[in-house]
């Protein structure tokens, strides 16, 4: 199967499953978990390389860049910048956000571009609908 058909099938599966796995926050926007995006992506692109690179770290921030390659061609990228003091696991969180943005750039995104992982710490945001598995 060629790349374009695999991409279409991946997006179609994501949209179908998003109906069941989306997390709704106050205001009615629906978000996807990075783990759900990655699982679906891997089903359609098991041969892809996901390359996460810690670009910089200092006393206040950590910056990650994630690339996805298929057949040695970059098909998507994503960046994150995380405040170190805001999370106990800021490095892991930053890597996850970078991957989520990379998968969103690929087309695996819900009603909103951000993932639920990014939205959890936003002030005045309340999760209304839990994940259904």
PLM region spans:
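Polyanion-binding surfaces on beta-sheet-dominated domains and ring/shell assemblies
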Residues: 1-133
């Amino acid at each position: 199967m060629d790349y374009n058909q695999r991409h279409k099938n991946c997006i179609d599966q994501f949209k179908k499953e998003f109906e069941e796995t989306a997390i709704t926050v106050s205001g009615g926007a629906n978000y996807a978990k990075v783990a759900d995006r990655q699982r679906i992506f891997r089903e359609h692109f098991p041969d892809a390389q996901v390359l996460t690179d810690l670009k910089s770290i200092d006393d206040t921030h950590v910056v990650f860049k994630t690339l996805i390659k298929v057949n040695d061609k970059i098909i998507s990228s994503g960046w994150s910048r995380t405040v170190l003091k805001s999370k106990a696991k800021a490095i892991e969180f930053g890597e996850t956000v970078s991957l989520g943005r990379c998968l969103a750039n690929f087309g695996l995104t819900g009603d909103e571009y951000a993932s639920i992982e990014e939205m959890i710490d936003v002030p005045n945001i309340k999760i209304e609908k839990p994940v259904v598995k």
